[in-house]
Amino acid sequence: MKKKLEHIELDVAFTVSDEIIVLFGPSGSGKTTILNCIAGLAKPDTGKIQLHDVILVEDKQTFLPIQQRKIGYLFQDYALFPHMTVWKNISYGMKSKAFAEQLMKELGIDHLRDRYPNEISGGEKQRTAITRAIATEPKLLLLDEPFSALDEQARARSHEELLRLHRLWNIPIILVTHSQQEAEKLGDRILYLHDGKLQRDQPVK
């Protein structure tokens, strides 16, 4: 996949199985742009992105709409609707509510269902956002620095929850982080990026 950005030209190629892949590198190395291209929020200039047997993007011929990609995306700022309760944030647009109910119990936020985002803590917002991302039953989960705003205790809890959810649902996850320690704790593989290029693809022992 290639995409020309303001200061760099992004040029990367990698595959993901049912594992946690970490995109690691300095600011401006193209990490978030990669997630946005996979999610359909940005278009690569050339290249191919495929999820299982479904082609999401292929050069100029194919560009699958966001809503058809079956991808969950957790943004750095969580992007919760401030005027909606926790339950409405999670269940918005869903036909079946049973899975969302199950997830809320799994992540320990069922007691927050009638509260609004401004009434809950940063860790609770993070768990609400990740519940919303998984509630759509995605085939791939994208996480853009989801733990950066949390304190040390909340971050440690969120790490354990993510690993538990991955073991439970076994879907591929691509995680962006600036923390080497976080990358090594959570990742099965770390992709080191610099100036839009993949420098190293390193398994975590």
Language-model regions: role of each:
Residues 54-58, 97-113, 163-164:
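Conserved ABC ATPase "signature" region
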Residues 135-139:
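A short, proline-enriched helix->beta-strand linker immediately N-terminal to the Walker B motif
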